[in-house]
Amino acid sequence: MRCLLDTCVVSELTKPKPNPELARWFASEHVEDLYLSAITIGEIRRGTAQLAPGRRRAALTAWADKLSRSFSGRILPVDEAVATRWAEIAASAERSGKPKPLADGLIAATAVQHGLTVATRNVDDFEPFGVMLFNPWAD
């Protein structure tokens, strides 16, 4: 299955003891079938930038650098096609009374535009966008 990893998936994998179901799923996947949105990279970088200078911030910054290198060629940008798709799915979610944050909408639009399934624990955040979903914590 070709998946776009939501930020919560990537963040969970940094924990000393990540969720066992997620860890098993991630280990069983072919790395070339896993993608990141540029939005996820931004969310991770924002999180590290918010930390006070010190060892934890330095370690997480180094990890983020390594993540970007390991997903080289598989970090999908928000281009005009993704932005247009976001406008469509965000408007649909708003019409149904379920507006969602911009970042989630852009991640969903990226997945739709590239024919990917969003891997996330936060299924409720993505359902209004009509994107294919997979919860590696539960499925």
Located regions from the model:
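A generic structural signal for short hydrophobic patches within well-formed alpha-helices
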Residues: 10, 41-44, 83, 126
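Acidic, PIN/NYN-like endoribonuclease modules and their adjacent C-terminal/linker elements
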Residues: 1, 108-139
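Short, well-structured N-terminal submotif of metal-dependent ribonuclease cores
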Residues: 1-40, 49-66, 139
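Residues that scaffold the ATP/ADP-binding catalytic core of kinase and kinase-like folds
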Residues: 12-13, 25, 47, 86-89, ...
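Short, structured coil segments at secondary-structure junctions
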Residues: 30, 71, 129-130
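Active-site neighborhoods of divalent-metal-dependent phosphate/nucleic-acid chemistry enzymes
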Residues: 46-54, 70-117
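Short secondary-structure boundary/capping segments
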Residues: 1, 24-28, 66-67, 75, ...
